[in-house]
C-alpha cells in the first residue's frame, strides 16, 4: 500500500496542556474541521471522541494517549496530521513523557484565564529535554478574565524559547469575535451559525489598527533576529514578504529558537482552522528533523536511522494496551523503513523475533486496517509481545533506541479480590497493566501474602482499580493508601557476616567483612570490590553483592528498602570445599545487617512538590493548613485574583487533601502535586511509623 501522503506532508504532533486548559476540546474541534467526526463531542457532556475510556468520560479528564490520523488541505495541498492526545493530570505525566519520544512537534495549549500552570511548565521542560519544536495556542479567550497579553508575557518570562505572536485577539471575554492575523494583516471573524466551520476575512477594524501595527512590528523584529539575510534587509528598510517571514519562522521554530503564539476559543469554535494552518506552516515533517540514533546490540556501536523507506526498518513501541477484541495493541512510531502486515520483526530490546499481525490506523477508539506502515508513520500493531520502550527493527540491522527512565511509584495500596474465582484472573490483569504502564507495579507482600499495587498518586491507583472492575469484571476490596517509605544510614560502619553449617556430608562456609557509608540522597547503591590477595575468590564476589542487595530489600528499622548506600567488601575468608555461592550470599546479607545496626539508620519519606491555586482571601487558611501538614512554604506568586502557593509537603500528610482544600476555599482552590525527593522523617513520627509497622507484622 502506497503512502496516503508523501513524508514531507506528514505531521506527528502532540497536544499538551495543564488539566482543564481545553486540550481535549481543541482536539475535538480539529477532528470536526478536518472531517473526522460529524458531530462535535463536548467534554462536559462526556461525549468527546478522544476520551474513550469510561473513566475519562465520567471524570472529564484524559488518561491514556489516544492517537488519531486526520487530513488538512493548505494552499491546495493535502497533509496528514497524526495527533497524539496526552493527559494533563500529573498522575499521568508518564504518558506525556512517553509520547514526547515519538512526536515531531507539539501544540501547547494555555488557558487565557489561568495562564502558565505548573504542569505545563513541567511538560515544557520535558519537551526541551526531547528537543521537540512547538507552537502555543492561548485558548478560552471567551472566558471571564481572559487576557492574551498577560499570558503571552508569562510564556516569555516562565518558559524557555522566545514566543512570537502571529495573531492577536479581536476582543476578549464575551466580546471575543475572532483574531487578527499579523502576517496577512487581516481580521478573521467566525460565523456562529455554522458552528465556526465558516469564517470571514475582513479588514482590521479601525480601533484595532494601531495595536495590530505595534504587534506586527514586534513579530517582524523577533523573526528577523533569527535570520542574518532578513536582518540585513530589515535594517536597510527593505520590504520583507510574508513568504520570507513564514519561511524564516518555520526554520526558527524547527530549530527551537522561537515559538509561534496563536489564540482562540475552541469551545466557541474560534481559532481552530488557523491553528491547523500553523501546524502545517511551522511544525516539522519527519524529514525536517535530525535522524534518530541508537546502539547496535551486537557490537555496541552507534547506529543512525534516517526517515526514509529505503533504510532498514526501525520503530519504537511507545504504548501498549490490551483490547478486549484484538488482544494486545502495540502503538509504534516508525522511524525508518517499512513494515508489512503479517511480517516478522526483531524486538531488539527483548532479543527475539516476533510476528506483527494486523496493522491498524487508529482514530481514538475506532480503527482502519492497513497493509503497510512506512517511515514517519504511527500505527497500532496486533500480535506483538512488546512492552513500552521496546525497539523493533530489521534483524539483519539491529538497533536499540534509548530506553526511557520512569520514576519509581510513591504510593501503594493493598487489594484483594472479592471472590476466590477472581484470584487467578487478577494476577493476569495486573501483569497486563504493568506492561501498559511502566509506573504501575504489583507485588505480593512476602509476610502477609497481600497483593500490593503501587503508583504515582491516589488518582492513578483509583483508576486502575476502576479499570479492573469495568474492563475485566474483577471487584476488589482496597486498603488504605500507604506511603513508600525507605531507609538509609547516617554514618560509616563495619559489619561482619559468617555463615558456617556443618551437617553430615558437605558443609557450607562463607565469610565477608564490609564497610558501609551513606551516599547523597538519590544516589542509589554502589558496590566496591576491595578484596586483595584472594581472601575471597573472584567467583564469590557477586554472591556477596547479591546477598547485600537482598538484605537491603528489608531494612532493619521497619523492613523498608534501604537506599543511598556505598558498600565496600574488603575482607573475609573461604573454605576450599565448603564455600559456595549460597553461603556467600548469606554471609553478605548478615554482614550488611550487622553494619546497618551501627550506621545510625533513619527512615525516609517521599516529599511532594505541591502547588495550590486559591483566591487571595483564602491564602491564610491554606497556608495554615499546609503548615499543620508539616509543609514548608517555598514561595508565593500573585496571578491577578489568584495566588499560587508552592510548598514541599510529606506525601503521608496529603491523603484526602482535595476534600480539605475544597472546604477551605469553598470549592475554588485547586492543587497539583508531584514527587520531589526523599527526606528524613522526624524522630517522633518515625517511631510511630516503625511501631505501627512492627505491630502489623507481628499481628
Curated annotation (Swiss-Prot):
Intrachain S-S bonds: none
Keyword terms of this UniProt record: Cytoplasm, Elongation factor, GTP-binding, Nucleotide-binding, Protein biosynthesis
Annotated residues for binding of GTP: 17-24, 85-89, 139-142
PROSITE patterns xrefs: G_TR_1, G_TR_2
UniProt cross-references to InterPro entries, sorted A to Z: EF-G-like_DII, EFG_II, EFG_III, EFG_III/V, EFG_IV, EFG_V, EFG_V-like, G_TR_CS
Pfam families: EF-G_D2, EFG_C, EFG_III, EFG_IV, GTP_EFTU
UniProt GO cellular component terms: cytoplasm
Keyword Disulfide bond: no
GO biological process: ribosome disassembly
GO MF, one annotated term: GTPase activity
Superkingdom in the source lineage: Bacteria
UniProt domain tr-type G: residue ranges: 8-287
Compartment list: Cytoplasm
Family: Belongs to the TRAFAC class translation factor GTPase superfamily. Classic translation factor GTPase family. EF-G/EF-2 subfamily.
PANTHER family found in the cross-reference section: RIBOSOME-RELEASING FACTOR 2, MITOCHONDRIAL (PTHR43261:SF1), TRANSLATION ELONGATION FACTOR G-RELATED (PTHR43261)
Chain's role: Catalyzes the GTP-dependent ribosomal translocation step during translation elongation. During this step, the ribosome changes from the pre-translocational (PRE) to the post-translocational (POST) state as the newly formed A-site-bound peptidyl-tRNA and P-site-bound deacylated tRNA move to the P and E sites, respectively. Catalyzes the coordinated movement of the two tRNA molecules, the mRNA and conformational changes in the ribosome.
Name the record gives this protein: Elongation factor G
Lineage: Bacteria, Pseudomonadati, Aquificota, Aquificia, Aquificales
Gene from which this protein is expressed: fusA
Amino acid at each position: 500500500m502506497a503512502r496516503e501522503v508523501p513524508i514531507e506532508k506528514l505531521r506527528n504532533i502532540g497536544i499538551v496542556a495543564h488539566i482543564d486548559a481545553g486540550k481535549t476540546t481543541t482536539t475535538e474541534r480539529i477532528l470536526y474541521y478536518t472531517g473526522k467526526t460529524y458531530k462535535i463531542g463536548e467534554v462536559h457532556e462526556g461525549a468527546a471522541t478522544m476520551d474513550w475510556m469510561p473513566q475519562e468520560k465520567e471524570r472529564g479528564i484524559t488518561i491514556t494517549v489516544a492517537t488519531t490520523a486526520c487530513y488538512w488541505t493548505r494552499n491546495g495541498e493535502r497533509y496528514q496530521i497524526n495527533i497524539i492526545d496526552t493527559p494533563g493530570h500529573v498522575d499521568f505525566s508518564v504518558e506525556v513523557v512517553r509520547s514526547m519520544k515519538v512526536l515531531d512537534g507539539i501544540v501547547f495549549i494555555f488557558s487565557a484565564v489561568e495562564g502558565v500552570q505548573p504542569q505545563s511548565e513541567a511538560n515544557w521542560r520535558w519537551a526541551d529535554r526531547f528537543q521537540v519544536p512547538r507552537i502555543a495556542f492561548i485558548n478560552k479567550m471567551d472566558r471571564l478574565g481572559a487576557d492574551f497579553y498577560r499570558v503571552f508575557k508569562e510564556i516569555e518570562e516562565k518558559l524557555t524559547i522566545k514566543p512570537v505572536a502571529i495573531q492577536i485577539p479581536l476582543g476578549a471575554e464575551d466580546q471575543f469575535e475572532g483574531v487578527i492575523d499579523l502576517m496577512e494583516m487581516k481580521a478573521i471573524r467566525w460565523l456562529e451559525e455554522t458552528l465556526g466551520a465558516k469564517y470571514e476575512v475582513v479588514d482590521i477594524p479601525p480601533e484595532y489598527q494601531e495595536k495590530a501595527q505595534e504587534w506586527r512590528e514586534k513579530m517582524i523584529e523577533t523573526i528577523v533576529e533569527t535570520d542574518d539575510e532578513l536582518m540585513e534587509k530589515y535594517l536597510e528598510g527593505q520590504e520583507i514578504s510574508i513568504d520570507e517571514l513564514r519561511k524564516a519562522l518555520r526554520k526558527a521554530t524547527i530549530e527551537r529558537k522561537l515559538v509561534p503564539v496563536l489564540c482562540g476559543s475552541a469551545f466557541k469554535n474560534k481559532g481552530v482552522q488557523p491553528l491547523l494552518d500553523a501546524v502545517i506552516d511551522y511544525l516539522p515533517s519527519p524529514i525536517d528533523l535530525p535522524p534518530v540514533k541508537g546502539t547496535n546490540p551486537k557490537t555496541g556501536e552507534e547506529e543512525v536511522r534516517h526517515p526514509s523507506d529505503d533504510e532498514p526498518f526501525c520503530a519504537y513501541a511507545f504504548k501498549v494496551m490490551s483490547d478486549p477484541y484484538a488482544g494486545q495493541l502495540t502503538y509504534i512510531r516508525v522511524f525508518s523503513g517499512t513494515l508489512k502486515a503479517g511480517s516478522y520483526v526483531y524486538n531488539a530490546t527483548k532479543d527475539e523475533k516476533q510476528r506483527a499481525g494486523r496493522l491498524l490506523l487508529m482514530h481514538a477508539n475506532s480503527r482502519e486496517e492497513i497493509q503497510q506502515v512506512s517511515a514517519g508513520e504511527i500505527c497500532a500493531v496486533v500480535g506483538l509481545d512488546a512492552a513500552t520502550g521496546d525497539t523493533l527493527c530489521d534483524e539483519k540491522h539491529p538497533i536499540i533506541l534509548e530506553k526511557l527512565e520512569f520514576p519509581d511509584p510513591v504510593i501503594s495500596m493493598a487489594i484483594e479480590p472479592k471472590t476466590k474465582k477472581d484470584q487467578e484472573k487478577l494476577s493476569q490483569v495486573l501483569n497486563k497493566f504493568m506492561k501498559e504502564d511502566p509506573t504501575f507495579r504489583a507485588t505480593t507482600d512476602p509476610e502477609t501474602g497481600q497483593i500490593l499495587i503501587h503508583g504515582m498518586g491516589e488518582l492513578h491507583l483509583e483508576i486502575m482499580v476502576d479499570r479492573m472492575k469495568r474492563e475485566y469484571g474483577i471487584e476488589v476490596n482496597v486498603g488504605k493508601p500507604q506511603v513508600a517509605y525507605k531507609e538509609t544510614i547516617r554514618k560509616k560502619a563495619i559489619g561482619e557476616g559468617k555463615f558456617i553449617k556443618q551437617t553430615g556430608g558437605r558443609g557450607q562456609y562463607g565469610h565477608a567483612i564490609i564497610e558501609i557509608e551513606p551516599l547523597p540522597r538519590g544516589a542509589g547503591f554502589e558496590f566496591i570490590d576491595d578484596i586483595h590477595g584472594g581472601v575471597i575468590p573472584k567467583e564469590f564476589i557477586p554472591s556477596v553483592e547479591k546477598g547485600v542487595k537482598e538484605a537491603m530489600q528489608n531494612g532493619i528499622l521497619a523492613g523498608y528498602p534501604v537506599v543511598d548506600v556505598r558498600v565496600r567488601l574488603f575482607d573475609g575468608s573461604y573454605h576450599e570445599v565448603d564455600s559456595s555461592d549460597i553461603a556467600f550470599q548469606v554471609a553478605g546479607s548478615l554482614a550488611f545487617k550487622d553494619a546497618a545496626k551501627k550506621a545510625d539508620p533513619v527512615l525516609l519519606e517521599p516529599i511532594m512538590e505541591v502547588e495550590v491555586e486559591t483566591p487571595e482571601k483564602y491564602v491564610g487558611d491554606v497556608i495554615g493548613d499546609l503548615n499543620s501538614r508539616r509543609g514548608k512554604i517555598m514561595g508565593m506568586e500573585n496571578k491577578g485574583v489568584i495566588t499560587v502557593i508552592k510548598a514541599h509537603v510529606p506525601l503521608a500528610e496529603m491523603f484526602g487533601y482535595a476534600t480539605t482544600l475544597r472546604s477551605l476555599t469553598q470549592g475554588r482552590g485547586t492543587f497539583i502535586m508531584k514527587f520531589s525527593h526523599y527526606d528524613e522523617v522526624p524522630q517522633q513520627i518515625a517511631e510511630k511509623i516503625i511501631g505501627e509497622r512492627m505491630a502489623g507484622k507481628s499481628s
